Amino acid sequence: MLSGKKILSAVLSAALLLPAASALAEDDAFAAEIERRYTAPSIDSRSEVRWWMAEAGHTDETIRAEIQAMYDGGFRGVELCAQGEDEISEADYGYGSAQWDHDLKLAMNTALDLGMTVSLTSGTNWATANVPGLDPHSQGASQIVVDIVEYIKAGASRSGAIPMQKKVGSKVYPIEPTAKLIGVFAVPQTSGNKAKPIVTDGTGIIELTDKLVWEADGTITLDWTPENAESKYRLFYYWQQGAMQESPPAAETAYCINYFDEAGIEALKEYWLAHILDDEALNAKIQAGDVQLFMDSLEISTEYGCAFWCDDMAEEFLARKGYDIRPYLYLTIGLPDLFYWDAVDYGSYDLADKTMREKVLNDLFDVQTQLYRERMLEPLRAWLHEYGIKTRAQISYGQRLEISEPIMSVDYPEAEILNQNNQVDMYRLWTGGAKLQNKVLSSETGAYGGYAYTEQDHLMEAYNLFAAGFNRIVWHIWSAQYGPG
């Protein structure tokens, strides 16, 4: 017979085992849930994939089949982009054609019906926001500063017609009849002509704009003799005109919009309203789904010019920085390509006062960053939100713009493997701003090695991204089973 103490001890032991058994059951349930999430993730936890479509060269059946294959393959969403094919007529099947509009909407409907996300590039191709048939000379199209340079040796003067074309190698670019004069400036040169860069005196710049004479025959002349006969000068003629940056494939030539003036966004709106948002049934699906406008790497180009511009760039700069930027525009000539983060921060010309050069260029790129946000990213985002569409953008690397502030002006910031070389330290240029804004950060992943990738290569890229603080992967790229036809 058990004593009272033994009975009490047995009861207490059993009572102690009950919470332990309960905890073990909870641990098993938690482990099972974690395993389920990894082995059978919900659609919201999956990665996405981009599909560069061969213009409108697919049949309805193959479009449906490809989208279904993406869904069955475990992808959360699809990013759609028009790409050119040599054997396909751009006029009939390119971006902006009736057939392209049909194919794009069919792909969107199919994906949205499956509960997938859909992203649309901001134009044909991936490089820019562009519009087929846009007047390249209008303020809605990308505008640049075209620079023409003359050398005035010591003791010399100049007279007669001013040069009206720019030579770049064997090519000649005329100043268009629609071009607008920005200004003419004489800059003292303090180094020899063979110096790289040519050094100048930023404190002795002389404006000559008011000395220009428009003759009756349309010729523009300038007569000027330097007061200091011992100085040599560079004369810079600055004109604003369209960059005429094209993006194929399109039914009409598609020109890059102006990223620094809201006229560019107005042109983009007109296209979207006429070609994408003109279907009420699809618009209802967009409102209920997850649709994004996607801006890929910012590959806008000054073409043969030296800087981006808009009608009131000089006025905006003066209001924000307190001085005239026009006399210093020559400092933007020949600046190196920043796609791979070149450390050199001077171009063909420099100032004797390098601190002044650094300040001037930083001020210019700060103002342009502000205009990029205020006149492009933010009004575009506000307008698209009316239709239930979010914005996703590979923020401003590759250009002389600040790369963290624009994160505030999009819904989803993005980086890419190709430019950042899958380096965690480079990714931090994006993760800091994204975390401060508490925004989902994605990456275009798999763009570096093409078909040379192994599965382990893909995994390593993904691991690096997640370790760096990224939340979302968009794989580059979907290989369609069916070719055009």
Q: Across the structure, where does each feature detected by a protein language model lie?
A:
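Bacterial N-terminal signal peptides that target proteins for export
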Residues: 1-11
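Bacterial N-terminal signal peptides
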Residues: 11-19
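Sec-dependent signal peptide cleavage junction
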Residues: 18-27
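Active-site mouth loops of central-metabolism enzymes
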Residues: 50-61, 448-454
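Active-site neighborhood of glycoside hydrolase catalytic domains
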Residues: 103, 353-390, 399
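Hydrophobic targeting/anchoring helices
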Residues: 127-130, 387-485
